[in-house]
Design a protein with these regions (language model features):
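Metallocofactor- and cofactor-centric catalytic cores in central/energy metabolism, strongly enriched
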Residues: 1-213, 218-219
Length: 219
C-alpha cells in the first residue's frame, strides 16, 4: 500500500446543527493534535438549499473520501522513500510460529449511534452489523470510514482508523512479547439489547480465537 505520509484531507463547511472544530496549526494547541503536522487539503462543502440532513452528511463524507482516493492514486507509481512491512499470518500459522507467546486480540469499538455518530466498514453502517474479525492491515488500508461529525476532538476520524496507534504498537510487539491474532470490530449501539448482543458476540469471537487477553478501545 502506498501512503502519502504527511498529507491529510479535511472536510469543512456547514453540517447538521453546529459542530464547530478548530485545528490549531501553530501555538500551544498544535502540540495536542496530529493534524497540525500535516499538509492539509481542505474541502469546503456548501449544501444546496433544502437538502435532507442524512443526504447532507453522506455527501460531505463521500466528498472527503473521493478527494482522498484521487490524491492517493497520485502515489500509485512513485518510488517509496521508506518501506514498512507488517506480517499478518493466519491464526493457525501464528500458533505454529509463536507457541509460547500470549495470544492477544484488539477489540475496536466503533461509534454507531445514528446521524453524525456513525462508522462504516466496507461501506456498511456498523449499526447493522454484528461483531466481526478484521485483519489488522485492513484498517490501515481504509476498511473503516468515520461518519462522526459531533463534538470536534473527541471522536475518531478516518485518519485515526488508518493510523491506529494501538494496532501499530501491537504490530511492534508481535513475535516479541505477544502473538497479535487480529482485530475484532464491534459497534456501540444505543439500545441495551443491541449492546448485550454485540458484547456476547465479541466475547464469543475472543473465545473462538483462543486468546489469552484482549485490548479494548472505546470511542
Amino acid at each position: 500500500t502506498n501512503v502519502l505520509r504527511g498529507c491529510g484531507v479535511v472536510t469543512a463547511g456547514k453540517i447538521v446543527g453546529f459542530q464547530e472544530g478548530i485545528i490549531d496549526m501553530s501555538g500551544t494547541g498544535a502540540q495536542y493534535t496530529p493534524f497540525s503536522q500535516l499538509h492539509n487539503l481542505v474541502v469546503v462543502c456548501e449544501p444546496i438549499e433544502g437538502i435532507e440532513k442524512h443526504a447532507h452528511e453522506k455527501a460531505v463524507r463521500m466528498a472527503g473520501l473521493k478527494t482522498a482516493d484521487y490524491i492517493g492514486k497520485l502515489a500509485k507509481d512513485i518510488t517509496a522513500e521508506t518501506v514498512e512491512t507488517y506480517e499478518t499470518p493466519s491464526v493457525k500459522e501464528g500458533i505454529r510460529l509463536y507457541p509460547d507467546l500470549p495470544r492477544v486480540a484488539y477489540v475496536l469499538m466503533l461509534q454507531s449511534q445514528g446521524l453524525m455518530h456513525d462508522t462504516y466498514v466496507y461501506g456498511v453502517d456498523m449499526k447493522q452489523s454484528l461483531p466481526t474479525i478484521l485483519c489488522p492491515t485492513e484498517t490501515m488500508d481504509g476498511a473503516v470510514l468515520s461518519g462522526n461529525c459531533v463534538s470536534a476532538c473527541d471522536k475518531n476520524t478516518t485518519y485515526h482508523h488508518l493510523n491506529n496507534p494501538v494496532i501499530k504498537h501491537l504490530f511492534e510487539e508481535h513475535g516479541k512479547t505477544l502473538n497479535f491474532v487480529g482485530v475484532i470490530i464491534t459497534n456501540e449501539n444505543v439500545y441495551l439489547a443491541d449492546k448485550m448482543r454485540s458484547s456476547d458476540a465479541t466475547a464469543k469471537l475472543c473465545e473462538w480465537l483462543g486468546v489469552d487477553g484482549a485490548i479494548v478501545s472505546q470511542e
